[in-house]
Amino acid sequence: AIYLMNSPEPDRDEGRIGRRRQAFLEEKLGSLPEKYVKIVAFHHHLVPVPHAGRETNVLEDAGDILDLVLTRNVDFVLMGHRHVSRILRISNTTLINAATTSSVRTRGRLGRSFNVIDLFADGSVKIYEWNVSLDKRILKAEYPPSLTS
């Protein structure tokens, strides 16, 4: 199950999910069978991302959202505001920050790239960064079946 949450706020760099959308997400995640792969995506960061500059741009309600995704055993959180590729695992949740495939404006020195997430039938996961600038696939994380369930 994939939930795309709108995090931008008009005329602000910071984002937030807000109580109404948080309640919606809580309800939807709570109704899913445990065996489902659960993915939540939004634009802003849930946690600060290294090498992202002075602006961390985490969600205003990041603590509440982090608690929700950990409590509801969300498998993957996808985000990417600052264009820096990063993968971080907290408990059984993998936070995946995307870089950029086209912009060189803010993080151009890091090259252009995107993430590829391979989910295997045995429950294992491999996450790659495909660096378009170098035409190279880089394994960023690998989790055996015991760590993905």
Predicted features and spans:
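Active-site-proximal beta-strand elements of phosphoester/diester hydrolases
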Residues: 1-9, 39-43, 94-100, 128-129
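Short, catalytically relevant binding-site loops at active-site mouths
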Residues: 9-11, 44-48, 83-85
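Conserved beta-sheet core of the metallophosphoesterase superfamily
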Residues: 52-122
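A short C-terminal boundary segment appended to hydrolase-like catalytic domains
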Residues: 120-149
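A general structural motif
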Residues: 33-37, 74, 122-124
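Short acidic, glycine-rich surface-loop motifs adjacent to enzyme active sites
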Residues: 34-51
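Binuclear metal-dependent hydrolase catalytic cores centered on His/Asp/Glu-rich metal-binding motifs
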Residues: 1-36, 55-63
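Short, acidic Gly/Pro/Ser/Thr-rich loop/turn segments
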Residues: 10-12, 103, 124
